[in-house]
Structure formats: C-alpha cells, structure tokens
C-alpha cells in the first residue's frame, strides 16, 4: 500500500483502517473475513479507549451487524489489472501479518499515536500513575485503570450485537466474537458454553458429569484435569516452586501465591454486592455471601448443626471424634485444625511476616492480622440476627449465639457438665485439678 502523508490533525479511524472493494471482498475466504473483522474491531477499540473517537464509523456498524463491509471508495490509483492486483495483495499482506490480539494495523495505530506524543495507551510521557481508590492497586495506563475499575462496579459496557452478552472489556468481546465466527466450534449442551479446543471441551464436560479420571497414587484423591493432579502431588513431595518476592514464603500452586501477594499489596478485588465488604479471592466472597442468604447446606449427623462450608463441617466433626490429625514434629503436639497447626509451627520458627501498618505489631497468621486491624478501624462485621449485637471476630459471634440457642458443646469428661465456651470448660477443669491435689495432700 502506498505510504500515506504524515498525519498532522487528530487521528481518525480511517487512518488505521483497510478498505476492500466489493470485488476484493468476494476474493476473501471465511477465515480471512473473520481476521479482518477482528483486526478492525480491535483498532476501533484502541482508538475509543484513548478517547480519539466520538462517533462509531460506518464500517464498525457493518461489522457488528454482520453486513459485508466493502466500499466503492478507492484509495489507490486505478487503470490496470496489475495495479488493482498490487493493491489487493498489499491489503492481504497486512492482514496475513496479523495475530489474534495484535495486528500490523494496530502497530500503525501505535506508531501514529507515538508521533503525537502519546504512548500506546494514550498517556503522555509526563503523566502520573493511576491508583484505584477501592483497592489501592496502581496502573501505568489509563485504559488499564478504567478496565480494572469495572471489577468493582461490575459494569459491562461492551455488548455483543448478535446475542446480547455483555463484557467488561473490549478484548473479551473480541474473543467472544470468535463464537459467532465459528472459531469456537465446541458447544456444551449442558450450559451452552462455547470452547475453542476439543481438549478444553472434554475437561469442561467433566464439570457436569463429575468425572475425575486422574488419580493420585499417594492418597487416592481424584481430579478432573491432569494439571490439577500434578499441582496436588506437590503436597506429598513438598515441592513449592512459587516464591513470594516480599517475604520469601513459597507455595505449591501459582494461584496460592497470587492470593498471598494480595496480603502485601492490600488488594481486595472481590466485593460483596450486599454489604460492600471486599475480599482477596472469589471463593471467600462466595462463602461470605452465604451469611446474607443464611444458606447452610452442610449438616452434622451427630448433633444436627449446619455449616456454610464443607471444610467447616469436617473440622467440626473432629470435636465429636476427638481426632487431631495434625502433628508437630518439633514438640509432638497435635491439632484438630490445619490452621492451628500452621500457626503453631511459626512459634518454633519465630517468623511473623504479617505486620500491622498502624501500630507495627506483627503476627504469624494473616487472619490474626485482619482481626487485629479491626481494633484500629472499629469494624464489627459479624452481627447477631437475634439481638443485633456485633462482633469483630466470627468466633465471638458463634460463642454469643449459644446464649440464644442454649448449645453447650464443651463437655467435662469427669463430671459430664457442659459449657458454651472452651475457655469456660478449661476454667471448670481447674476445680477437678484442685480436688485431686487436695486428696493427694
């Protein structure tokens, strides 16, 4: 394509678009047309994201509506078949050099914007970073900052014209267009989800069938995907390849490292839409939301008590069985809960990586730090539904609720007397200890 004169005025979509005539368009096969669509939509999205377009070009409207986007307006001199063939081949060359997410046309957009004193994201070189007021995360580019904020607001401004599904960012919409373009041919009949690869489709179907063909030879636990099995096996081998740059703590899974790093950054991107409380990971906010719904699907067969999480039920059942499966190799002490065991091990190492920014006090566990920080903020997020009393810790609420229910789960083995709190049972046992001491004397 003939070189264009350097653009002096505002950048327009026409400066970075490629136009095909009707004859040229008919020479394109389905894959080439789909590629053209992706490239044009991405270039349009780039210009919109930096505020260089105020109206939607006709070409984009045609693409979104599924119409043929050819035009009779010519950029090239005409007159011979050789010239026309040259122009068509030049246009095709630009498209063939494209990839799914970054195209040669996009590079032209980038170079023109840089000539205007802007970087690829539309910032001048003297502009400052962008900080999110919700979670404190800092972004180099304004477009990344705007896209991130939608995690907090749940805004989905990018809507598919064909099926109506909306997305938070233009890249997700572009990826979704592949469904309609036939680039994601595997459709799940259970939930309607489209998948690009056959292997991904097979793994996805196991969610519905609950098939778990990959078995751990150490403990017998089964998994849907081989990658999850390999990650699980690190529990047995002790391998922890993912290390935190801030405190040096290592993890078996990359996802666990990502969650841990949010402790240092303070980022809590997952927000409860009921009370506004923010969390570091999605699974925690889902569990938290059961507080509002009152859902407790996991019930103890021994006492009938119900729980929001299956893991809490398993831990609770150890009160009935007396099982303490976590043993400290340093001192021989045993624990009912893995969290208690992990916290205990830090007493031997003396490591307290979680420090309060307000008073400097350090803790062995992040959960203890979170609870401690409520002393400074005055936050009491756990409310009793019976009387409205609020507590800093969930354990305080649980103990308080026993006043209303009359539950006394802590029983003395010597006299059978029961108590609502473990501390009350410990205090009571001193009576028996004193009685035994008096008998001995």
Swiss-Prot record:
Role summary: May be involved in transcriptional regulation.
Record CDD domains: KRAB_A-box
A GO CC annotation given for this chain: nucleus
Transmembrane segments: none
Pfam families with a match to the protein in the record: KRAB, zf-C2H2
Protein name, per record: Zinc finger protein 485
ZnF bounds (C2H2-type): 130-152, 158-180, 186-208, 214-236, 242-264, 270-292, 298-320, 326-348, 354-376, 382-404, 410-432
GO molecular function, one term: DNA-binding transcription activator activity, RNA polymerase II-specific
Keyword Nucleotidyltransferase included in the entry's annotation: no
Gene name of the encoded protein: ZNF485
GO biological process: regulation of transcription by RNA polymerase II
Compartment list: Nucleus
Keywords (A to Z) from UniProt: DNA-binding, Metal-binding, Nucleus, Repeat, Transcription, Transcription regulation, Zinc, Zinc-finger
All residue ranges annotated as the KRAB domain in the record: 11-82
UniProt similarity note: Belongs to the krueppel C2H2-type zinc-finger protein family.
């Amino acid at each position: 394509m003939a070189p264009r004169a350097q653009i002096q005025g505002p950048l327009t979509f026409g400066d970075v678009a490629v136009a095909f005539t009707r004859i040229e368009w008919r020479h394109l096969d389905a894959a080439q047309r789909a590629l053209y669509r992706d490239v044009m939509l991405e270039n349009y999205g780039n210009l919109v994201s930096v505020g260089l377009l105020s109206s939607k070009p006709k070409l984009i409207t045609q693409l979104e509506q599924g119409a043929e986007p050819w035009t009779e307006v010519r950029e090239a001199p005409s007159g011979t078949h050789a010239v026309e063939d040259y122009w068509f081949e030049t246009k095709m060359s630009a498209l063939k050099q494209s990839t799914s997410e970054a195209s040669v046309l996009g590079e032209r957009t980038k170079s023109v914007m840089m000539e205007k004193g802007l970087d690829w994201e539309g910032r001048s070189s003297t502009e400052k970073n962008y900080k999110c007021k919700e979670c404190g995360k800092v972004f180099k580019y304004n477009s990344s900052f705007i896209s991130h904020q939608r995690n907090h607001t749940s805004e989905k401004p990018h809507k598919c014209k064909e099926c109506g599904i909306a997305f938070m960012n233009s890249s997700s919409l572009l990826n979704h267009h592949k469904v309609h373009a036939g680039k994601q041919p595997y459709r799940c009949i259970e939930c309607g989800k489209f998948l690009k690869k056959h292997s991904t489709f097979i793994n996805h179907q196991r969610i519905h069938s609950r098939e778990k063909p990959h078995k751990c030879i150490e403990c017998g636990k089964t998994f849907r995907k081989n990658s999850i099995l390999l990650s699980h096996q690190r529990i047995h081998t002790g391998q922890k390849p993912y290390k935190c740059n801030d405190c040096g703590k290592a993890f078996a899974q990359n996802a666990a490292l990502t969650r841990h790093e949010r402790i240092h950054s303070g980022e809590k991107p997952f927000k409860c839409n009921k009370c506004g409380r923010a969390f570091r990971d999605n699974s925690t906010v889902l569990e938290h939301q059961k507080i509002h719904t009152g859902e407790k699907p996991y019930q103890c067969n021994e006492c009938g008590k119900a729980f929001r999480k299956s893991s809490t039920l398993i831990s609770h059942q150890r009160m009935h069985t007396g099982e303490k499966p976590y043993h400290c190799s340093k001192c021989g002490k045993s624990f009912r809960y893995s969290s208690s065991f992990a916290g205990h091990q830090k007493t031997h190492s003396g490591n307290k990586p979680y420090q309060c920014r307000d008073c400097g006090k350090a803790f062995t566990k992040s959960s203890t730090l979170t609870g401690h920080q409520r002393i400074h903020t005055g936050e009491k997020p756990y409310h009793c539904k019976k009387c409205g009393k609020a507590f800093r810790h969930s354990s305080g609420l649980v103990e308080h609720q026993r006043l209303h229910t009359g539950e006394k789960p802590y029983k003395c083995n010597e006299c059978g007397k029961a108590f609502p709190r473990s501390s009350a049972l410990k205090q009571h046992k001193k009576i028996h200890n004193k009685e035994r001491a008096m008998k001995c004397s």
